[in-house]
Amino acid sequence: LLPEAGTVLVEGMDTRNEDHLYDVRQKVGMVFQNPDNQIVATIVEEDVAFAPENLGVPPEEIRTRIDEAMKLAGIYEKREAAPYKLSGGQKQRVAIAGVIAMRPDCLVMDESTAMLDPHGRAQVMKTIRQLRAAGITIVSITHYMEEAAQADRVLVMSRGRIVMEGTPEQVFSQTERLHGYHLDVPQAAELRDELVKAGIPMPENVITPDACAEELYKLLK
């Protein structure tokens, strides 16, 4: 996808320049909403190997890459399984493994938990935290505010423009403004606001259940 106006640079490379497309695709990997649209093989490890093979990676290195990717995505024990037998969360982790086998610097998750049940979402979020700990940059596009609250940095977009930006605590302390953009806030932040309305003092940076419980414990001591 190319910009209709302006310029998009990926590590200094203009995405409009066709000479850069191969390098850009190696820098950034993408995981979509529906893993069934991203899985192409009949065996998990064959699917994870698909992208490195297309990139011309030597066979011996492909074996190393797919093993590392499956372990990092938490799907190694299912390496010989047929994808259609997996749960939604497991399929999404196969899709993630297939992308990180290309060893991109950045992974873009486009509503990657939207089609999953709560258990599947929890599986994928655990994998995202592991990838972040491994040094991979994660850009997650989501309407689930509980997921956004786990990020290092949050950007709110409206009509194609960034309208809010900051840490989760900075962004989710502005409940009314977020509601103005038709967005919810994490449940812990909603509870914080209701407690404040009831006359119970709560810090604005309370946006997670643990932080909320800690502040309530302080009040009860």
Where in this protein do the model-derived segments appear?
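ABC ATPase nucleotide-binding domains
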Residues: L178-K221
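Conserved ABC ATPase "signature" region
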Residues: E60-K78
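Catalytic Walker B motif of ABC-type/P-loop ATPase nucleotide-binding domains
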Residues: L107-D110
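Conserved ABC ATPase signature
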Residues: A82-L86, Q90
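ABC ATPase NBD Q-loop/coupling interface
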Residues: T7-D23
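Conserved catalytic motifs of ABC-family nucleotide-binding domains
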Residues: R103
